[in-house]
Amino acid sequence: MDGKEFQALVEGARSYRRYSGEAVPREELLALIDAARFAPTGNNTQLLRFRAVGGKEDPAEARQVFSHLHWAAALKDWDGPEPGERPGGYIAVCLPTSVSSNPVRLLDVGIAAQTLSLAAASLGLGCCMVKSFDACLTGELGLDRKGYDIVLVLAVGPRGEKVVVEPADPDRGLAYWRDDEGVHHVPKLPLPSLLI
């Protein structure tokens, strides 16, 4: 992969919030986790743990996770994907309860999440990092009994919406938005405005 191909992969690894509704096989979720295990962590602690949820093997568990997620705060009139548009599986990113709010460990979570997202994009899958979820999800999946907290959930599935990256418009701001055709627009600042 050359630099242009990598740039295209990063640009394609957007937050997808609508999916085809097709379940993701557990082996594909595990392949994403396998990529994330190579991501760097502070002091090489490797404290992150992952839970592959739902997919073809457990649609009931996927519905359970979905019921605890809160989607797209910037889209005020949208309550999340409808049946038939929901993710095909999930990956819960977990930390030991004793360090689940440690800033360095949360950096590890972000690095792993981006790795998972890029791995999903490389397989043609959409992914969305969801931080807004009900705290009881950790207990419902039995992870609290193992001493872990869910700190991030990644929704994964075949893409079911068009996402367009476009130059930021100063009059519109940086919030993502949907047009009348349902196309999801993601404004991005130009490179010169990021350099200081």
How would you label these PLM feature ranges?
Residues 1-196:
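Acidic, surface-exposed loops and disordered segments
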